């Protein structure tokens, strides 16, 4: 078909064909190689390819590929969380997170999300919820460890085994063991308590298709506090073959504040919205709100080089 004539799309289809024939998506040399090639192929952002306008055959392939990526990512996190949790009792697993292949990406993403959040909040959040935290809750860990030293993180996941592994990661840390709390529940069953959080993160892998993603967002809108911030992961350009896209039209009941598309090796785009009904704050077409003061953590801030900071400011300028 015509929409498959693009060379890059052909490469993605070929990789999908190979991945879909794998007997297992658990970490192995073959699995790691194929997904590594897939990510590298999908990273370029200087393309005019719009995955939402492709033919139905490619759209169906993309939907299946996103599910395969999510399954493989879950196995990868489970694998490394198990290894880290099995370290000797006198070792803190959080001191060895660098063994996870994509840890540096989470450091960058955490820094990016903290900076974006600080642009749209006048106070430091005291309680944050992360929905879909998984067996290796790296976003919560990075934010708690490097950026928000006094914030409590409530991590929600439907999988009790994932929460057990995640809890083992932080149980030996004198600080995070007190500030990381885990809840085993389906977010769609969580009706009470969601209004306690200043910020709610919705993981990219919660809602692997448009219908289920919108359903999760609608549920959060119904139960979050007015004025609370919702942070979501989306995808842009070819990266949308790896993760679902969150559009502004999906955010009914929220004021869209920012959509930021990284151009480096951070795959996910970041979407920030505010639940309507709270104090009025400028959105994507207005001026920014007050910035709360970040913690003095130069170690992690050094992760973002000057070029990365410049790109971020330019992106803000384009949005505004």
UniProtKB/Swiss-Prot annotation:
What's any GO biological process attached to this entry? pollen development
Q: Which InterPro entries match?
A: Nicotian_synth, SAM-dependent_MTases_sf
Q: Which GO terms describe its molecular function?
A: nicotianamine synthase activity
| Pfam families according to UniProt | NAS (PF03059)
Superkingdom of origin: Eukaryota
Name what induces it.
Constitutively expressed.
Q: What class of enzyme is it?
A: transferase
State the tissue distribution.
In shoots and roots.
**UniProt keyword terms in alphabetical order:** S-adenosyl-L-methionine, Transferase
Q: Does the keyword S-adenosyl-L-methionine apply?
A: yes
Q: What is its EC number?
A: 2.5.1.43
- State the SUPFAM superfamilies in the record: S-adenosyl-L-methionine-dependent methyltransferases
Which PROSITE patterns is this protein grouped with?
NAS (PS51142)
Which transformation does this protein catalyse, written as a reaction?
3 S-adenosyl-L-methionine = nicotianamine + 3 S-methyl-5'-thioadenosine + 3 H(+)
Q: Which family does it belong to?
A: Belongs to the nicotianamine synthase (NAS)-like family.
Q: What does this protein's UniProt record list under function?
A: Synthesizes nicotianamine, a polyamine which serves as a sensor for the physiological iron status within the plant, and/or might be involved in the transport of iron.
- Its protein name is Nicotianamine synthase 1
